[in-house]
Amino acid sequence: MPYGTRYPTLAFHTGGVGESDDGMPPQPFETFCYDSALLQAKIENFNIVPYTSVLPKELFGNILPVDQCTKFFKHGAVLEVIMAGRGATVTDGTQAIATGVGICWGKDKNGELIGGWAAEYVEFFPTWIDDEIAESHAKMWLKKSLQHELDLRSVSKHSEFQYFHNYINIRKKFGFCLTALGFLNFENAAPAVIQ
């Protein structure tokens, strides 16, 4: 029996950072720092599959903090994510990394919710930062990106933008920072019927 395309109906937001004095080339921050960031984000035992940024309307009001979802996690499962994540080496001049994910929801001409879009933000800083700087920069760039996504599609804003961010001041040789949405529950659209 055929089934249609799959779409998420429950998501969570999370974030994590990691740093290390050890790493393997060519991207030493990917080796130990990335795993540590996944651990802090509580998604270290998933197989991570990143994808782009379109959100079905069924996710509206169904994006929860990660701590509300961990009891449903399955070791070794595939976790589809929208992730802003990057690593850096302090010898390249990066002392801090900030990441963020923003969400916008659009409405049609009748005011009905169409669905949403996400945007990702990553920024490297030559000095240490604090949460106020990380949050303000994330909101500034994500707001611009989210508005672009709406304008590009000629869609009106349905509700307030949502923002999630994270940052790290790197104290070791290598660092990694991530902010992510993870998708847990799914349904299927009606299958296509071609006459």
UniProtKB/Swiss-Prot annotation:
Keywords on record: Cytoplasm, Decarboxylase, Lyase, Pyruvate, Virulence
Catalytic activity entry: L-arginine + H(+) = agmatine + CO2
Gene Ontology BP annotations: arginine catabolic process
Cleavage (non-hydrolytic), annotated site positions: T52, S53
Pfam family, one: PvlArgDC
Major site of localization recorded for this protein: cytoplasm
E.C. number: 4.1.1.19
Taxonomic superkingdom: Bacteria
Assembly, per entry: Trimer of an alpha-beta dimer.
Family of the protein in this entry: Belongs to the pyruvoyl-dependent arginine decarboxylase family.
Full protein name: Pyruvoyl-dependent arginine decarboxylase AaxB
Organism listed in the record: Chlamydia trachomatis serovar L2 (strain ATCC VR-902B / DSM 19102 / 434/Bu)
Lineage: Bacteria, Pseudomonadati, Chlamydiota, Chlamydiia, Chlamydiales
Gene giving rise to this polypeptide: aaxB
